[in-house]
Amino acid sequence: MKQTPDNKILKYNSVFLGTFMFSFGFLKLFEPFRTMFDVQITKSGLPRFSIPMGIAGEMSIGLGLLSASCFRQKISNLFSPIVFVASAGLIVNMGIATCVHLQPEVPANVLPLGIKPPFIPLSVMFLAAVNLFQLHRGNKRQS
């Protein structure tokens, strides 16, 4: 498979998002991030099971994007479906994160970088949408 500029965007974007999501999910297993995430979920009104589900979701999305990108040549027929599912899941995950940021009860000091406006989740959501767009363009060209 020849590397086109679109393929490179998809690959590098997937590696970045995968690393970002896995890292942040993994960090939430340790203090002080564990407590900060617990406060975010509790104050936003989401149920308690959202805490382990959120961590597992972030780590699995990250691993999905990283594994698809790293083993692209070996799993070429699975690359697009894995990146599609992980990117779509990331958009849902970041939609929930945006809602958490917008809850008035959630203090800024427990959010990433202490930033109350949802710049980070919206930026990540945009990058995940870029992945979906690149996959769509690639599929259109092949047919």
Residue ranges and their predicted role:
Residues K2-S143:
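Membrane-interface extramembranous regions
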